[in-house]
Amino acid sequence: MASSLLEPSLAAIALVILLASVSLSRKKRPAAPEPQGLSVLGNLFDIPKRASSIIYLALGKPYNTLTKRAVSQLQGYTPGSHIDATSHSPRVFRLPNLEETFSVFPDHGLNPNYTSARTDSRAWINQYTKVVCGPKMVAFMNNCEFELSNSHCYPYAGYKGLKATMDLTNILWLYDEYTDTGSGAEAVKAAGIVARALREPDYDDGTWVCRMMKSFKQNHIDKAGPGVARRFIDNFCNYVEVVGREAELREKNEVLDIPNYVTFRRETSAVRTCFDLVEYCLDLDLPQYVHDDPVFISGYNAGMDLVFWANDLVSYNMEQSKGHSGANVVTVIMKSKGVDLQTAVDFLGGYCEALTAQLLEAKRILQARSDAAYSRDVVRLMDAFGDWVRGNVAWSFETERYFGKENKRVKETLLVELKEPFVGALALKE
């Protein structure tokens, strides 16, 4: 297909999508034809004049209005022309209506295995939380109902698969809290322990991190297909390595530019590992040529980016109150481009609409192929990515993780009142 499939009015958003379509695989991709021109959105993201596989994808007609809205939100934008984020401190901002945007993905409800899997997963993770966390932090994490997110995001999984996803989610939250409070050196050391625990059968240094990861691998990853197991271990080891780098950036109070943050966030979000378990839960083990396919990559990246962009939006208030907002795309856009908070949030809402179109279009193209690995198996996977995207946002308004007792009010009004820094924040050992 040629780039002429893109309507001229959508060329701008295609360039934004381009940023989301690169770097999944560390292998170089064949160059694609160069699209015509740059736009206000291309300028915002400093996107070079080159194209990726998504340039081949036509955005579906129902999304024309949505993607044009993303462009119109920043029409007339000139870098530095808005209020500098460092000198402007609004107390309230409005979230984009992500539930409306993601309503194009079917609502498959909650997983019927939720209650039994939750009980067993919580008993398993509590072996490690009681070592790391104080009683108040344990109570807070229990109230966050992390396991409920898996019931939303994996509605099709059997008990075995759902328990695996809950165990992983509990690992990720515990590891995140642990590394958030430690130094960069401590995070790097923990990453080394994780890598050896996953890759060396006889390694055991006696730490809670080592025991936790070896137990998870034996319970779940050793039972997955060889491709899924290999990708999960590689992706998890890369995740903990980059989390160590995140801790070092936090110590230096360093904020990345937008392109580097995109690449960085794809790893620190750990969404790749969650998507590995999508294959596991669906009893799939896709061949590597599927994972290397450019159209598959564009759909995969769209789903992955939608998960962590949405997370950055809903978690911004919590993170800025803890002094961790530097590792959030809202701050990255504000700092890099000198725009105010609401402008950055509005842009991200439009960006999520464009990525939604990208995911659906990738699925449409792959479904038309004769190879059943695409037309049957990948379609199931892309549908499950939609469950993840929609379920992640639904859970974000049910948990107290991001908005505390105000979660239902925020869901209804979309208005978020900024917390004062460090007010109500819990220490890990508290």
Curated annotation (Swiss-Prot):
Instruction: Specify the glycosylation sites in chain numbering.
Output: 113
Amino-acid positions noted as binding Mg(2+) 1 in the UniProt annotation, renumbered to this chain: 176
Cofactor (UniProt): Mg(2+)
Q: Top EC class per UniProt?
A: lyase
BP terms from Gene Ontology: isoprenoid biosynthetic process
Swiss-Prot/TrEMBL keywords: Glycoprotein, Lyase, Magnesium, Metal-binding, Signal
UniProt xrefs under InterPro entries: Isoprenoid_synthase_dom_sf (IPR008949), Terpene_cyclase-like_2 (IPR034686)
Q: Which residues bind Mg(2+) 3?
A: 311, 315, 319
Q: Which positions are annotated as binding (2E,6E)-farnesyl diphosphate?
A: 401-402
SUPFAM superfamilies documented for this protein: Terpenoid synthases
> Domain of life of the organism in this record?
Eukaryota
Q: Which GO terms describe its molecular function?
A: metal ion binding; terpene synthase activity
Q: What is its EC number?
A: 4.2.3.-, 4.2.3.88
Positions contributing to Mg(2+) 2 binding:
176
**Which Pfam family name is an example for this entry?**
Terpene_syn_C_2
What the record says about its domains? The DDXXD motif is important for the catalytic activity, presumably through binding to Mg(2+).
The record's family statement is: Belongs to the terpene synthase family.
Function of the protein:
Terpene cyclase that catalyzes the cyclization of farnesyl diphosphate (FPP) to viridiflorene and viridiflorol.
What is the designated name of this protein?
Sesquiterpene synthase Agr5
Show the taxonomic lineage: Eukaryota, Fungi, Dikarya, Basidiomycota, Agaricomycotina
